[in-house]
Amino acid sequence: MDNILGTLLNMNGKTKDNLEARQDLRKMNLRPKLHPFTAENNKTYLPAACFTMTKKEKTDFLQVLHDVRVPDGYSSNVSRCVKLKECTVGGLKSHDNHILMQQLLPIALRGTLSDKVVRPLMELSGFFRDICSKTLRVEDLDRLENRIPIILCQLEQIFPPGFFTIWCIWSYI
């Protein structure tokens, strides 16, 4: 969740879209439109990506999260973690991240970015919502297993490679 919020909101120290990520794209010869360039004033610039939010889009997105009200005990007050002036979200507890990912992110993203960006993120939210549901049928797991590679491929076409944190899961015998 940190990678998603940090990158969408371009939060300092949290975003996975930075100069190094863009230089990696250049080295891999991927997405030339996103390669950094140096202007006449010798400053390096990063072209806007499809997931780059404008100030208004950030404000609209965060306003939804700030204004959301949930029943007591459902989650902590997410609005306390939203900083509208700084356009950041921080201090979320683990359960709040789950609620944000599974329930609130799809609502907050509507109307902010293009369908190309929003749809895979909404599907990822749906994946986590389904996999964490109280009841799961084998057919549901089969559907989810078939769908997740497609979702990840769509996300790989949108976000830079550094966006994807690699987790090592060790099996204990």
Language-model features: locations:
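A structural signal for the principal folded core domain
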Residues: 1-173
